[in-house]
Amino acid sequence: MGLAGTKTKQRFGLDPRNTAWSNDTSRFGHLQLEKFGWKPGMGLGMSPTSSHKTHIKVSIKDDNLGLGAKIKRTERKDEFDNGECAGLDVFQRILGRLNGKQEEISKELDIQRKQKIIDGKWGIHFVRGDVLASTWDPETKKLKSYSNDKKRSRDDDDEKLSSKNKSKKQKKDKKDKKDKKDKKDKKDKKDKKDKTEKKEKKEKKEKKEKKEKKDKKDKKDKKDKIDKKDKKDKKSLKNNIEVSTTASNIPSTVSTRLSVRSRWIKQKRAATMDSKALNEIFMVTNT
């Protein structure tokens, strides 16, 4: 294409080969294996020298196929290969005809053919999962049992101890709950008592303050009344003194044409100021 062609850029990350995690020697698994005697380059298992030394690869399953289905498909020669020997059913029919069991064999082969068709469309084949070689006995075809009497007795003792510890723990928990409940009840009672005492003290204090306020108010009212009465008496006495002084300050002779009128006013004022003259005017006798 040359320089005029479309340019495509390709970016590489910091770890394009994804080897940073495998080269990291500070991981927990790496350190733990080294504690058990493993060294880099060794394999795992009973014979580390001949075991698998590369990293375990995990592939994501994105289909509904069973285990080993993809491997089986890769082993097929073509798309028509179903993994069985071609012409085997025909050979079995010939053998059946020679042995005089043609009907039985043909019937069985028809049943097998129909069963394959049904299983191929709607059937499910279950594959038995393998177990560890150390736990499987091929002769008896059973799992090996390594339990013995000592282990059983030890397990029984452990169960007894665990049950005892459990019962002790339950008793302790019950006791702790009871103690906590008692403490809480005591605290609630004490708080209630303190509240009632505080309330009573507050009420007594309020009553006392009200009484003191009332007493102060009464004293103040009495004092105000006495002060008012004293002021009133002083004022009336002062007015009497002023009137008497004004009456005494009136000139004896008035050299005007209204001298007769002024004399009459003077006599009238003097008569009103004199209690004895007033008694004579109103004809009141002192007994």
UniProtKB/Swiss-Prot annotation:
Gene Ontology molecular function terms on file: nucleic acid binding
Gene Ontology CC entries for this record: nucleolus
Compositional bias (Basic residues): 163-190, 201-220
Name this protein carries in UniProt: Protein PXR1
Cross-referenced InterPro entries: G_patch_dom (IPR000467), PINX1 (IPR050656)
Keyword annotations of the record: Nucleus, Ribosome biogenesis, rRNA processing
Biased composition regions of type Polar residues, renumbered to the chain: 239-251
Family membership noted in the UniProt record: Belongs to the PINX1 family.
Renumbered residue ranges of the record's region Disordered: 143-254
Main location: nucleus
Role summary: Involved in rRNA-processing at A0, A1 and A2 sites and negatively regulates telomerase.
Keyword Kinase: no
Species the sequence originates in: Vanderwaltozyma polyspora (strain ATCC 22028 / DSM 70294 / BCRC 21397 / CBS 2163 / NBRC 10782 / NRRL Y-8283 / UCD 57-17)
BP GO terms, sorted: rRNA processing
Short name of any one Pfam family annotated for the protein: G-patch
Gene that specifies this protein: PXR1
SMART domains cross-referenced by the UniProt entry: G_patch (SM00443)
Basic and acidic residues biased stretches: 143-155, 191-200, 221-230
Domain G-patch: 25-72
Subcellular locations according to the entry: Nucleus, Nucleolus
